[in-house]
Structures are given as structure tokens and as C-alpha cells.
Amino acid sequence: MTSINVFAIIFSIAVSAIAIGIFCYPFFVKWQRDRLMAEQFPKSWLSIIESNLYVYSNLTSEQQKELQGYIQVFLKEKQFIGCLGLQITEDVKVTIAAIACLLLFGDRRTYFPNLRSILVYPHAYIVNELVMNDRYVVEERRVARLGESWTKDQLILSWEQVQQDIRNWQDGHNVVLHEFAHQLDQEDGQAEGVPILPRAMDYAVWSKVMTAEYLQLCDRVENGKKTVLDGYGATNPAEFFAVATETFFEKPKQLNQKHQDLYEILQRYYRLDPQQWQN
């Protein structure tokens, strides 16, 4: 057998092994996630979510069990990085994971696939940002931020803000829900307020409802009228989806009363009905 033939055989085996690996990898990931979902939930983690996740006690026992499984998979697959001296404790990781995983009930078993690392600052962090001033000149300014979702593999949060949101769940503001909603939106590589929808949902209906609600919010903000949705949602469709998600989970009854079509489409998307959680 010539050296060329040996090389061809080795190359063929290597290519076959790679192909088998690529084919089998999704099955391995599913097996690993199913195993994590079935594991006993740590008592220390349960204590944290019972204390820090306002709506946990309002979930059904089945939903609580499902959320626990999501949290275990999430914490296995995502890396937490403390910034500016912040120590990543169980409290930090489990609290953030519990809030973020509320968004996974809608059959999103990909677990924010673009996300690899969550950077957590002790408080608001400063970034340099290019902005246009009143004279239409672009200049660089230092801006304080509480959170940010990147289209590649990172998400940033202020732990101080996360703690504040825990204490004020029903105020309509939640940096974890907001930034992880952006992750859902960015899953297809675009940030345009249109996440990947379940098969049962229609993109045309989504677009019709979201566009109408977004334009209505823009009009009310421009005219100084009160809104259930935070005015920041009028920035662009991507921010509207993130703000609508916050409001859906934190002010569900008010959202349904004022924006029933929006509430119903988010209810179908997230497969939860937060109105049932409010007294």
C-alpha cells in the first residue's frame, strides 16, 4: 500500500469521524440538558429563588420544577465574570439565571444560544459612546449604563440594579428581563424587535401588532402622554420589544387593560400568563 493510499484512508476516517461528531453533537447536548433538568435542585439555590424571584411562589408546581431545570442548564452552560472586584457568588448567579429563565417557557430550549458570558459589575458602568450634539456634530461622551446585550456572545449587567429590580418587581423595570429579551431578539443575528417565533405563531400577525403598538407609544411619548410602557421603548423596535417584555412580566394587568393585543401576543410567545400572579 502506497503512502498516498494510507494518507487517503486516514483522511477519510478523520472526515467521517468529524461528520459523525457533527451529526451526534445535537443529540449529546439534548441528552446532557435532559440529565441536568432531571437532577435534584440544590437547596441553597431554592432558598435564593424563593427570596429573590418575586413571582416564584405564584408559579404552579409544574412550572417551578420546569424553571429549576432551566436554571440548572443555564448555569452549566453560561460563564459569569465579575468586574471591578465583584465576587460571583451563588446569590448573583442563581438570581440572574432565575429571572432570565422565565423567558424560556415558550419552548426556547436553545438557552440563548449566542450567549457565552455574563459580565456583572457591582454598579452602573461607564462606556465611551459616540453621540450627536445639538449642533449635529458627533462627539464622544462617557455614559453610565445598567446593562447591555451584545449580538455576539456577551451580556452585561449591574448587580446593584438587579438587586433594586428584585425589590421593586412591579414597577415595570427589570434589567435582566430587558437584556435577555434582547438576546432572544438577536438570536437570528438581527436586533429588530422580531425574535424567532414558535411554529404556531404568525410573523405577519406579530409584525402587525408590534408595529401598531410601537407607533402608538412613539405618538404618546412625543405628545407627553402617560403610558403603561416605559417611554424608552419608543427608541426603536428592538427596545420596544425589550420594554414590552419587562411590562408583560411586571405590570401584566395594566398592560392587558391598555394594550390587549400586545399582551395576548406576548402571552402566546412566552407561554405564560403573568396576570395570574398578581393579587
Q: Where do the language-model regions lie?
A:
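N-terminal signal-anchor transmembrane alpha helix of single-pass membrane proteins
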Residues: 1-33
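A metal-dependent hydrolase signature that marks the N-terminal structural subdomain at the beginning
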Residues: 28-143, 261-275
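Short, function-defining helix-loop hinge/capping sites that tune catalysis or transport
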Residues: 68, 186-190
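Metalloprotease/metallohydrolase-associated module, dominated by Zn2+-dependent proteases
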Residues: 95-112, 121-170, 190-279
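Short, flexible segments with low predicted structural confidence
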Residues: 20-21, 38, 212-214
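Active-site recognition of the HExxH zinc-binding catalytic motif
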Residues: 60, 171-187, 242
